[in-house]
From Swiss-Prot:
Similarity comment: Belongs to the Casparian strip membrane proteins (CASP) family.
Pfam families xrefs: CASP_dom
GO cellular component: plasma membrane
Topology Extracellular: residue spans: 60-70, 137-155
Keywords associated with the record: Cell membrane, Membrane, Transmembrane, Transmembrane helix
Official protein name in the record: CASP-like protein 5A2
Source organism per UniProt: Arabidopsis thaliana
Top-level taxonomic group: Eukaryota
Length: 179
């Protein structure tokens, strides 16, 4: 049995009129505020950087922080957090300026993993520093010889930086999991 097959002929779109204005790229519905490439995401990155850098500077300004491992860990973790947040803030500024979405699967994976690692390190360092600060202040009662105010301030700033980093991680992880 010989059956004829329909042939498909491509149909070209008529050329766009020269008077039409090209629409700028728009933000997808998936881009909730707080995600990378949004204004709230940029604000979260800015506050992460600000508080992590402040914690780093306050702790590094004391002369005896290198003698305690937890305080050295806090300096390293907040240094990493501030560099990560600053780099991603610059990426967010670029994405906002050119109106592009940062919802590429690989980018979201990178952001989620990086945010998870840096926020976990910052939280662990803040907890360790808080433990040492409580030991020095309450248990040993030796704040007169130490920089307890700077230690407590730096620890509090590290916790605030973690509070700003946690939503970024959760938004990126949620975006990655919902694909």
């Amino acid at each position: 049995m010989n059956v004829s097959h329909a042939s498909v002929h491509p149909v070209e779109d008529p050329p766009a009129a020269a008077t039409e204005v090209e629409n700028p790229p728009r933000v997808r519905m998936d881009d909730m505020e707080g995600m990378p490439g949004t204004l709230l995401g940029l604000a979260l990155r800015f506050f992460q950087f600000l508080f992590a850098a402040a914690a780093l500077c306050v702790m590094a300004s004391t002369s005896d922080f290198p003698s305690v491992t937890a305080f050295c860990y806090l300096v390293a973790a907040t240094g990493l957090q501030s560099l990560w947040s600053l780099a991603l803030a610059m990426v967010d500024v670029y994405a906002i300026m050119v109106k592009r979405s940062l919802q590429n699967r690989r980018l979201v994976s990178l952001f989620a993993i990086g945010d998870g690692v840096t926020s976990t390190l910052t939280f662990a360092a803040a907890c360790a520093s808080a433990g040492i600060t409580v030991l020095i202040d309450n248990d040993l009662n030796s704040c007169a010889q130490n920089h307890c105010v700077q230690f407590e301030t730096s620890t509090a700033l590290a916790f605030i930086s973690w509070f700003a980093a946690l939503p970024s991680f959760l938004f990126n992880f949620w975006s990655l999991a919902s694909r």
